[in-house]
Amino acid sequence: TRTYYNDFRTSLELASNVAGSMNGKMYCPVIFWMQGEFNYDPNPEKGLRANVPNTTDKQEYKRLLIQLKDNMQNDILKQYGQQEKPVFITYQTGAQYMRDTLAISMAQLEASNEYADIICAGPIYPMTDRGGHLDANGYRWFGEMLGKVYYQTKVQGKTFKPLQPTEIMREKLPNQVCIKYHVPVPPLVFDVHLLPKIRDYGFEVYLGSYRQENRQT
C-alpha cells in the first residue's frame, strides 16, 4: 500500500543507493516538519485510517507528532547508518486555520518544550499569506527563520526557544495582570510602525465570554 510515509522511506533508500554508487554516504542532520492545518477541523477523509476523522485533540496530536518524530529518526539512522539522530524542527500552525482552542499550535509548542530533540522555530502568523497559505515572501521569510534556528542549534551548539509566556499572574490591583515572557532577543516590542496597531495589542481578558469580533472560526 502506498502511503506518504512509505514514500519517505523509499526516498531514504534511493538517496542511500545513489550515494553508495558514488562511494559516498548520506547524512541527515535535521528534519523540518510543517503540518497541522487540517487538524483544526475534523474530516473523515483526512484521518490516519479510512472513515476515521483526523484528530483535533491537543494531547492526541502531540502523541502522534512524537511517534512520527521517533519513526522518522529511527528510519534515518537505520538507512544511513549514522549515529546521531537528526533534530526535529517544527513550527506553530497559524493563519486562517487556527481556532479558538489553539489545540494544535499548543501541542507543537509543548512538544518542543518537553523534548530536547524537538525545536519550535516559532509561529507563522507574522508572515504574509494568501488565503492561509504563505505567499512567496512569507515562505522566504519563514525559511530564513528555519535556517537561523538550525544554524544556532546544530552548528553553534546553542539552545533556542521561541517567544512564549513563562508566567501569568494577577497583580495586587484587581484589573491588572502580569505576563512574563521568554524573549529570544530582547527587548519585546509591540510594532505599530510596520503594522497597524491591534486592539489591546491582541490581548483579551474575559470571564464567561469574549468579544465576538475576536472569534476565530
How would you name each of these model-derived features?
Residues 1-217:
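Cell-envelope and extracellular/periplasmic
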